[in-house]
């Protein structure tokens, strides 16, 4: 089925021949995607909106389309019902509105009144829904599409209780790269002294071009940037606004016409199964040749800077359970907690004083929910918890990427029997060593777990990777790539022995992966596994996206820029070995930088 290109409607905005041609190209590209996901083709007018925002640069407009779609999906901005609560009250709060005047260039003027925002009263996702809804009403106008948007952030009369750093970051990210509007400038008016610190944090996330458009002004300075005819009275202008009633005009007669993006957002991922993964192909995936060119362009310093962009992002979620006084002794490192939202919960048992806490997180793999459990190297006081987790999660494979000691420091406890036929008892679980195989770069141990309460036995394969240096990263990824393949094969074979599971009737049990803290080498191993799986299936991958999404599940995954750079290096090394690029060609990008 070939993608259909939407015809130019009679009421479409007037475009130049070049702009019309760009619109046709954009629709051809996007509608390949809509056909793939079996959704309605994008309309001509919607296409023009995205192209206007990027001055009819087709590639940049396609990127914007996917950023907009992904942002709406991520923030739950779908099937909006402005006449229903809580969205109706948020729209009518007046904290955000579109003025009924334009600046001298014809740009629309959006106004956010900070003193009306009370984070403890308004759910952040509802605030974002209202913001999207009202901005969409503004850019329905061809004049706004053509002439852009001025955003005023009015902080007059506000205090710290009205400010929400995470919301501010999301709004700026939206305006700079995820909404179809030309952002002309952002005027921050009447900012208190305390605002300098959070603004310095936010500004680090912005490109220079966007940062140049942001100006922090005193109230008396606003008229130097916009005439009084364009400003509300409280900012020295002539525009009368009753914030309590002004936004009534933006409510539709009924809940409005269906939003074409609802279908696109809801259908852009596979059906919502219980085991959907965050690691699915995204819009910015690179081919292997594009990756080579990208690394050559960015060089080592640029890749390190890319990691810093990831590192600066605040963790998504909370750490209440990890930081609970009763659980602190179960954390190997005080600064490596695990997220409440993805933590593995142990079953509490009668007669035992244990909590359900272990420093371990469920992590998705490529197109597989909970493919891994990322965890710290077990402590003596958590051995029993570790094996209980392995039993309860029906784990078949354990991957250890550290030694017991490195650089004279203890990295992990000896939580399994090392010698053949030896056994260790952990409560009602007894672990027996059935045999050890010593390879060049790793050790493979077959273990049997006997649950004396349930009178059941299971086999688990334990791999210990031995070729990671005490400091830094391996000079070559060859041994790790080989090791990864061995682990994959063992998991596939073990799952196949389970019968029904191998036919996809229920999700595979996770692979337990740990190092010492459970974030550095663990994150590197899992990132490489995900990227190579996508590369082998589709011929594309995105390291930045993979690591960013991974950190939403196992916070702080990949600890250093060196480990992040190693992921790129390992992928290129793999591609060269597999003949995806000419021998020696890809690694030229990695040398001497």
From Swiss-Prot:
Q: Where found?
A: Cytoplasm
Q: Which Cys residues form disulphide pairs?
A: none
Q: What is its EC number?
A: 3.1.3.48
Reactions that this protein is recorded to catalyse: O-phospho-L-tyrosyl-[protein] + H2O = L-tyrosyl-[protein] + phosphate
Does this UniProt record's set of keywords contain Protein biosynthesis? no
InterPro entries tied to this protein: CRAL-TRIO_dom, CRAL-TRIO_dom_sf, CRAL/TRIO_N_dom_sf, Prot-tyrosine_phosphatase-like, Protein-Tyr_Phosphatase, PTP_cat, Tyr_Pase_AS, Tyr_Pase_cat
Per the record, the major location class is cytoplasm
Report the transmembrane regions from the record: none
GO MF annotations in UniProt: protein tyrosine phosphatase activity
Q: Where is the Tyrosine-protein phosphatase domain?
A: 303-574
A single Gene Ontology biological process assigned to it is: negative regulation of neuron projection development
- N-acetylmethionine PTM positions: 1
Top-level class of the enzyme under EC nomenclature: hydrolase
For this protein, the record's PANTHER family field holds: RECEPTOR-TYPE TYROSINE-PROTEIN PHOSPHATASE (PTHR19134), TYROSINE-PROTEIN PHOSPHATASE NON-RECEPTOR TYPE 9 (PTHR19134:SF285)
Question: Function of this protein?
Answer: Protein-tyrosine phosphatase that could participate in the transfer of hydrophobic ligands or in functions of the Golgi apparatus.
Instruction: State what protein this is by name.
Output: Tyrosine-protein phosphatase non-receptor type 9
